[in-house]
Amino acid sequence: MDFVNALKARLPDYAKDIRLNLDAVILRSSLSQTQAVGAALAAAFAAKSGVIVDAIRDDATLDDAHRAAALTAAALMGMNNVWYPFVEMSGDSELATVRPELRMNAYATHGGVDRQSFELYALAASIVGKCEFCVRSHYQLLKETGLTTQQLRDVGRIAAVVNAAAQVMAVESRVEEGALSA
């Protein structure tokens, strides 16, 4: 997983904890290597980090199916992480009973991978998207598939660290462009 070292090299000293956490949460996860990297890819997409998405997408850790599934799950969560909080924030009990009529056919095929992996990628993206309804839903489904609390904690840790790395890299790229003073 060369992408981890490539990402760590981009993080400045003030983000040393984030740099060290990248190793801990991805390379030493209780999840399978595929699931850990897929969760990182989905979280990077949700964090809108093209740099991290490209680094993971170019790495050979994920096969084409899991790469596509992580991106599909994250894209769907980009929609759902807005829709479901909107319904909740509206406070309209009638709206909560109306079908969203948003296309989500990828759920039927789990993005081309097993259901557990697809739900795990959706959870990682929803954590970054901060959709409480979505996090609860995916978390519960994953518990029902047999994932442990520790494994689900690791999804949260991956999402948190990837999100932090994305923020640091976004700011640092602006500093390099001269848009911000260091």
Language model feature labels by segment:
Residues 1-182:
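Hydrophobic alpha-helical segments
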